[in-house]
Amino acid sequence: MPRGAQPKIAERESRMIYAAIKLFLENGYEQTTTVAIAQAAGMSSSAFFAVFANKEALLLKLTKWMYEKQFAITARLLGEGYEPEMFYAVEPSIQMYIAEKSEALRELYVSSYSYAATANYIHQMATDKLVELFGAMHPQYTRQDFYELELATSGMVRSCSSVMPSTYLL
């Protein structure tokens, strides 16, 4: 790779991600095209594919960032020495809160759980967190056990996120 190419790619990636976030929030993930993202970033549509293989690859990058921030925010809110059960309760609550803020954010969460690469990342990362939080308490559990618990939990969260709670009228 020629000298100076790395910063150029990083700048393009950053511009594409910023444009994508703006468009995803305005139009939703499904309705936003790669052409629209490239245009909003002030680049050609071919420039998009020089940075990301497809729109799902961009979603994966964004999903990784979102979940890293979400975990960091949860830990910061709880402070030092938090109980693992508290983290396990608060983190999905933050997800639900974010998803309830707007239809576009909710759709972005649902999309993240709907595509193979992003869903796999979420499940693997959440499994790692479960092992970190509860592995010492449950030494008899394997990573596979924690993975299956993650699948069950994320299924419930995704089901709740699929429909805006305001549509449930009592």
Positions of predicted regions on the chain:
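Helix-turn-helix
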Residues: 15, 23-57, 61
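Amphipathic alpha-helical packing segments from all-alpha helical-bundle domains
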Residues: 113-162
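N-terminal intrinsically disordered/low-complexity leader segments
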Residues: 1-8
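Hydrophobic alpha-helical connector segments
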Residues: 61, 72-105, 115, 125
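Catalytic or ion-translocation cores adjacent to nucleophile or general acid/base/metal-coordination motifs
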Residues: 12
